[in-house]
Amino acid sequence: MKALKALAVATLGTLVLAGQAHAQAQQPIKVGVIFPLSGGAGPQGQHVTQAIQAMATIINESGGVMGRPIEILSRDDESTPAVGVSRANELISSGVSVIIEGWNSPVTLAMQPVINRAGILDITAISKADPILSGEGNPLAVRLNSSNSQDGAVIAKYIADSKAKRIAFLTENDAYGNGAQEAIENELKKMSYAYEKVAEEKFPFNQADFRVALTNVRSANPEMTIAINANEGLGMPALIRQAKQSRLPGQLVTAVGTVAPSVISVAGDAANGVIGADIYFPDVEPFASNEANKKFVAKTQEMFKYTPDKYMALGATSLQVWAMAVNEVKSLDKEPVANRIRGGSFNGTIFGDVKFAANGQLESNHKLFTVENQKIVVRPVSN
């Protein structure tokens, strides 16, 4: 009788443990997402968050991550470093396995050491400042968007190819904006390209009135004005409209990745003729025929009635690559997942077959474009 009781207790214990293991296996994996959801960049941050939710749905429909569903926990950083740090701490306390963040470089740079100390993988989707990958705030940093250095080479080449000599800068006065301008000028110097910087105007991220700055630039009679403004919801559309109203001479060239369809929608006809460059266009090859991209675009349109732009694609790909890495290394731990991504290659992403540099930077292909009839028209590749 005692033996039977012992066997029954042991069997019950085994069943309880098995039930607990099964319950744990079915518990969602929490993914933290931090972007501006209010203020000037709020609309874009909301779109990026929606894109990540669309990708989470695609992943969950395909079996999830290590057999578990993904749950997205989203927070608003309000484009403010201190708020971003607070939101990061909230997500850390909530038990997230990874945090996908980064619209504004100053916010990303403030959050990095906090997330790193918590032992959680931090993936920067969009913020561009070069120090993000310096290793100071996060020795295992990963970034999807192109860097200021990569972008600077693209804009510098366009300046040189255009043979423009009188150059003006309208630059956001923070880590992103100053770094972007510095990268362009450094590349021009490397090319030994002779030019004159006829005007330079700096402004804060939240500025929306550029009339005084544009008056100063206009009086310098530039052949080309480089506009560096990451406030796509408010600042960049306002700058484009006011540049048109001021009859700014020469070409208006925008920093890489700062003119999306949402910017053109707000700027209206004033956007026609603007030059820009980017790394993703949903309906242009090689993206148009990419099955992973087609699936992502269709799911985003189904869920949110919106065609994704570059920012949304970067957010979704951040989650997609993380999920691929976790499923491969079979661990949620920061170090093995980060080491799989940094210096690694991934096939079948939204961006196609991709490769990350050893420092965590996704390698990108840039395309120049012109805005015509309020549409982005990709320019032919020049040698």
Descriptions of predicted regions:
Residues K299-M312, V321-K375:
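Segments of small-molecule ligand-sensing domains
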Residues V85-S86, D130-L133, N138-R247, P286-E291, ...:
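Extracellular/periplasmic Venus flytrap/periplasmic-binding protein
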Residues P28, P43-Q50, I58, V65-I132, ...:
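Beta-alpha junction/loop-to-helix N-cap segments that form part of ligand/metal-binding clefts
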Residues L17-A23:
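Sec/Tat signal peptide C-region and signal peptidase I cleavage site
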Residues M1-A8:
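Bacterial N-terminal signal peptides that target proteins for export
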Residues I29-A51, R75-A82, W103-N104, L170-G179, ...:
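Extracytoplasmic "Venus flytrap"
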Residues I240-A316, E372-S382:
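Extracellular/periplasmic periplasmic-binding protein-like sensory domains
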Residues A23-I29:
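Cleaved targeting-peptide boundary
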